[in-house]
């Protein structure tokens, strides 16, 4: 569940922030709205521009950290992010809330274990950012619809990419796609593997407990 939340944060958070701050401010409490307004006072760029610029700066730092070997690469990523973020806020180029949004987005993408998988969602983030920045919540919903529609049409070795969510399955099978139970406790096979024999084979043990 934590990885799913991290994936949603890394993909949707910038777009949702722009949608709320530009089009749907009425859903925010007054005190929070005033805090956002005070934080943006004096910033010369629009909220979309400052968020895109800071995201690109953090992507450059990430790439620099990957290219530099050893512990120095990690140090460049951490120290570089802190220095650039603090300098940008001190120079009144970006607001502190945008630095927080970018930092949370970066942390969410780091939780995703596969780097190529995470890179795809980092690119998708910019699409949601533009849609949310210029179309509001409706743009974010449109982006989700287009993304899910595309993923639903993909096949991996003849199996739908979003199995077990795109086919009519039991609650048990759908739940297995969200929760990871211990392997020894799994009684049933995945829905795409040998449907005629859904129960997994068990190891046979003799009376002394030895496996055969």
For the regions a protein language model found, what residue spans apply to each?
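Alpha-helical membrane-protein architecture signal
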Residues: 29, 33, 80-81, 124
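Long, contiguous hydrophobic alpha-helical segments, chiefly transmembrane helices and signal peptides
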Residues: 1, 15-18, 84, 92, ...
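Hydrophobic alpha-helical transmembrane segments of membrane transport and translocation systems
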Residues: 98, 103-212
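Conserved glycine-centered short motifs in functionally critical loops
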Residues: 66-69, 75, 80-98, 102-116, ...
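Alpha-helical transmembrane segments and their membrane-interface boundaries
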Residues: 1-66, 71-75, 166, 170-178, ...
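Alpha-helical transmembrane segments of multipass membrane proteins
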Residues: 15, 56, 60-63, 82-87, ...
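Transmembrane alpha-helices and their extracellular/periplasmic helix-loop junctions
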Residues: 19-22, 34-39, 45-50, 97-100, ...
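Membrane-interface elements of multi-pass transporters and channels
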Residues: 24-27, 39, 64, 68, ...
């Amino acid at each position: 569940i934590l990885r799913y939340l991290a994936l949603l944060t890394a993909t949707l958070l910038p777009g949702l922030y722009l949608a709320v701050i530009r089009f749907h401010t009425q859903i925010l409490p007054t005190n929070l709205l005033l805090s956002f307004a005070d934080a943006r006072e004096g910033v010369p760029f629009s909220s979309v521009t400052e968020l895109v610029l800071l995201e690109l700066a953090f992507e450059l730092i990430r790439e620099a950290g990957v290219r530099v070997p050893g512990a120095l690469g990690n140090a460049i990523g951490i120290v570089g992010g802190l220095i650039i973020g603090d300098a940008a806020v001190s120079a009144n180029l970006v607001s502190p809330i945008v630095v927080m949004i970018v930092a949370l987005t970066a942390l969410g993408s780091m939780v995703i274990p596969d780097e190529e998988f995470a890179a795809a969602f980092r690119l998708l983030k910019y699409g949601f950012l533009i849609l949310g920045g210029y179309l509001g919540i409706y743009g974010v919903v449109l982006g989700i619809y287009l993304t899910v529609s595309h993923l639903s049409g993909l096949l991996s070795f003849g199996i739908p990419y979003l199995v077990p969510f795109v086919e009519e399955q039991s609650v048990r099978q759908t739940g297995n796609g969200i929760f990871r139970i211990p392997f020894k406790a799994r009684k049933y096979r995945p829905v795409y593997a040998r449907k005629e024999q859904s129960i997994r084979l068990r190891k046979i043990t003799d009376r002394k407990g030895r496996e055969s």
